[in-house]
Every structure is written in C-alpha cells, then in structure tokens.
Amino acid sequence: YATQYTHIDDFVEATRLVAPSGVVQTRRLPGSGAGPAPDRLVIGSEGTLGVITEAWVRLQATPRFRASASVKFGEFHRAVACVRALAQSGLNPSNCRLLDPLEAAFSGVGDGRSAILVLAFESSDHPLHAWMARALEIVGDHGGQYDRDAVERSMSAEGSSEHRSGAAGAWREAFLRMPYWRDPAVGLGVIMDTFETAITWDRFDEFYRNVKEDVASAVRKATAQDVRLSCRITHLSPDGPAPYFTIVTRAVDGSVASALAAWGVPYLIGGSLAR
C-alpha cells in the first residue's frame, strides 16, 4: 500500500531461516515488544544470513469497495504539500502516488506541465464515500483538479473498474510495462533506470532539487548527452515520502556508474538509497 502498510514485512508473522550455523525459527505472534524484531532482521538480510524456507504471512481480504481519483496540479510544490497533508490525515489511502510533470509525461498521463496524483481507497468491509470526500477536500485546499463524475463512478458499485481507467489506468499500464521496455531500450542505445530514496518532509524540497541537479550533472558528464530525470512519490509516511527517480539518457562510451560513484549517494544530502 502507499500508506500505513508500505512494506511486505508488515504482513509477515513468522519466518524460518536455514543458516550455515543452524536454523532460526521465529514465533507466531501478533506482535512483540521483547527486543529487536527478528523477522525484520531475517527479511532485511535478503539472503546474506541464510535461506528463508518458510514464512507465515497475514492474508488480506479481497477489496469489495473502491474509490479513486486522478488529480492534476499546476504546481509540483503544492502537490507535494497535498500528499503530505494526506499522509498525516489518518485517512490511509491505499494508493497515493504523485508523478512530477516529467514523470507524468513519460507515463502518458500528462503533457509535461502538470503533476498528477493517483489517489485511491479500498476496503473489503465498507463503502468509502466519507474517506474520499475528506481526501478531496484536502486536494481542493491545495489547488488540485479532478473529475467529480469519474470519482462517483468509481464508488458506484462493488467491483467497479473505474480505478483502471483514465490517468490512473494509463499510469498503471505504463508502470507494469516499464520493465519490458527497459531491456530492449538498452539494445537501442537508451539508458533507463530508477533508484529509490527516502527523506523527511522538512527536507524534501531541497533534496528533490539537489538530487535532480546533481544526478543529471553526473550523467551528462559521463555521457556528454542530454538527460531526463523524473520523480514519482510512491509511498508515504507521516514523517516523509519515498521519492523514486528515473534517469533516461543515450548510451555512449563512458561510465555512468563511475560518475554516479563520484557524485555520491542521496545519503550525503540527508536521504537514503532505500526506503
């Protein structure tokens, strides 16, 4: 999910790890305050400590009710303020993904001048009119524009497919197809890759600006080619977002990796290369 449960770790109840020195089996408990969480350690090790052979995962009921909206913002900084307010509202939308103008254009959902917010709620238990109504009040407070009729259609009946139409549907299709486009693009001389970061809200504006300027400068230095660097915010915590940056440039002789290593990682300007 975009908020609240943003990691698969949140749904893992217990694990069994086979390591060179023996087997680690964690207990099945709904929660524990007895020291560091061993399941987080096991999952976060990503195979460096051993092989996970079993896991208990909390299943989620299939959603019966949905509500969705595609929102346009003329100014990216107002869109960021909006998703911050949503993240801190307690509404916990299941989808709250913000595309900057260039990312929106790459995804085929914008013209490169407006930021796009893909906003959605889902539940297996109850209709979501009240949640969406309050979220759209927040959107309106920050200058967002949306199609009211489309929002109503998304909530009109159980099993509505409105959330897969319009800008939300176009972005979803582009997101799913991107890995299939990336590898053939390399063969055509195009470098395209994405890296994830995390930062607190109070430092986001400067972080966003510095990452775009510094990474673009490093790639231009390595390739002597123009570069496009876009951003999407995919996951939100009350204290900060997880911005993903995508680089697109032409491939030439030279080492982009060495240039990026010389530039350093977002950690150096207060962020992280993982969320």
Which residues fall in each region the model found?
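FAD-binding subdomain of flavoenzyme oxidoreductases
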Residues: Y1-R97
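Long, contiguous binding/interaction regions
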Residues: G270
